């Protein structure tokens, strides 16, 4: 039997459709919820991924509910590994949206991310999504550093190659009211509350 679990929120993705005579309110852009599912038996060998310790419990609960055989390892490194960081950009001008896909993480990661974030914001982007691979341990204080740059955890997503990536969002100074989001499943509401708490850490 298929089992579904809310795995990611994608916030402020594109503008609502305009209707004559109808006035919008806060959250003038659409946000999306994504779900993962195990459509068959769960006999595949367990796949392990690295996750920040702070998100291990919520990620484990997502995989457990979806009955997907993934183990979340919360090992952390004292600091970022040597080497240069590579982040690929996929800018969608019509949405004022950008995907920042991390290809490699080196000691200059946060400097590179800060520069790219400032550049896209100055060129009209108002929402940035950061896609981070889970094939290596994260450095201690990873999320705290991302929070300082305005990025906050929004979930996890499967990639085409069968791997998993963490998703972080930066609303680039947009006001956002999580109370306006309406969900009809307990796990989606729980994920929304979790993401809201992460968002609020960027405001401190």
Regions found by a protein language model. Give the residues of each.
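Terminal substrate-recognition subdomain of acyl/acetyltransferases
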Residues: 1-110, 114-140, 144-204
């Amino acid at each position: 039997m298929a089992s579904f679990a809310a795995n990611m929120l994608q916030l402020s993705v594109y503008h609502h459709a305009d209707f004559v005579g109808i006035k919008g309110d806060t959250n003038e852009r659409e946000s999306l919820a994504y779900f993962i599912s195990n459509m068959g038996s769960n006999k595949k060998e367990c796949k392990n991924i690295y996750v920040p310790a702070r998100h291990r419990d919520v990620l484990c609960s997502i995989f457990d509910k979806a009955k997907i055989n993934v183990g979340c390892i919360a090992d952390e490194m004292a600091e970022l590994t040597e080497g240069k960081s590579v982040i690929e950009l996929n800018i969608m001008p019509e949405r004022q949206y950008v995907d920042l896909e991390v290809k490699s993480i080196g000691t200059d990661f946060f400097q590179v991310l800060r520069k790219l974030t400032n550049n896209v914001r100055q060129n009209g982007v108002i929402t940035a999504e950061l896609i981070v691979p889970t094939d290596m341990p994260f450095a201690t204080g990873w999320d705290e550093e991302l929070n300082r740059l305005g990025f906050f955890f929004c979930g996890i997503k499967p990639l085409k190659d069968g791997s998993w990536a963490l998703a972080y969002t930066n609303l680039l100074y947009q006001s956002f009211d999580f109370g306006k989001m309406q969900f009809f499943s307990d796990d989606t509401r729980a994920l929304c509350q979790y993401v809201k708490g992460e968002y609020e850490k960027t405001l401190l």
